[in-house]
Amino acid sequence: SAASDVYKRQLLDIDAAISLISEFEEPTFAILKHNNACGIASRPTVLDAWKAALEADPVSAFGGVLITNRPIDKAVAEEVNKIFFEVVIAPDYSVDALEVLTQKKNRIILIQKENAIKPKQFRSLLNGVLVQDRDLYQERPDELRQVTEKGVTDEEIEDLLFANKIVKHSKSNAIVLAKNKQLCASGVGQTSRVDALRQAVEKARSFGFDLKGAVMASDAFFPFPDCVEIAHEAGIDTVIQPGGSMRDNLSVDYCNANGIAMVMTGIRHFKH
């Protein structure tokens, strides 16, 4: 039935939302549609995180699944209540926040309890079931390998890891553009990594983001320098990617010639 189809879709988005938010320790708010983040930001307060997350794509936020890793109070609830959404998830809610959020019908309001993410994933495939390890690896700053002449600052490392967490939970091929711990835009589910980047750049510009000083994260390596060329033209000068292509040197050489900093993780996140 149509109702059961909606419920199934919500469950899939809820699962994706919980997996994504588990990556972040700072106050963070995320908005998801069809298992991908269309908005996410980390800020000192939940209210500021919500506002920054919504800025990334207020159009796609319509009908989305919202999640935060901090309790929601009345002030946050009043802001969230201004848009149409299907599901909101938080560790807790104040009484007056619930009074606000329950004003509109057919909303699903969930409390996320502390529980470990299961290490295995199961997926039906042809006449059987595919069992695989869940991608739970989290890169650390000291594991990033600088491969360009230009280095990265501590602030840029924070943005690089922020973007890398998002791209890890985005459908491949995926590119994420972020700045000051705010998603500017992403290109997801593309058959070409170049198309994913072009999609992200166009989307960021359409919502008024200045990409100068933004970082780019890719969920897999660059076999050619075309992605760093497009990123450079857009104003991006800091990149994180797994590396591992036989032609890594082509992208590294372009970065060195154009003042771009690049780090490699050695870990490919390839969500299907």
What positions do the PLM features span?
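Glycine- and Gly-Pro-enriched alpha-helical subdomains that act as flexible
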Residues: 38-59, 176, 182-228
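Phosphate/diphosphate-binding loops
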Residues: 60-121, 243, 252-270
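Long, charged amphipathic helices and adjacent flexible linkers at domain junctions
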Residues: 51, 110-157
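Short, small-residue-biased leader/transition segments that mark boundaries at the very start
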Residues: 2-7
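Short beta-strand segments
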Residues: 31-33, 67-69, 112, 178-179
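Cysteine/selenocysteine-centered motifs that mediate thiol-based redox chemistry or coordinate metal-sulfur cofactors
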Residues: 66-67, 73-82, 207-248
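Short, basic/aromatic recognition patches
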Residues: 151-170
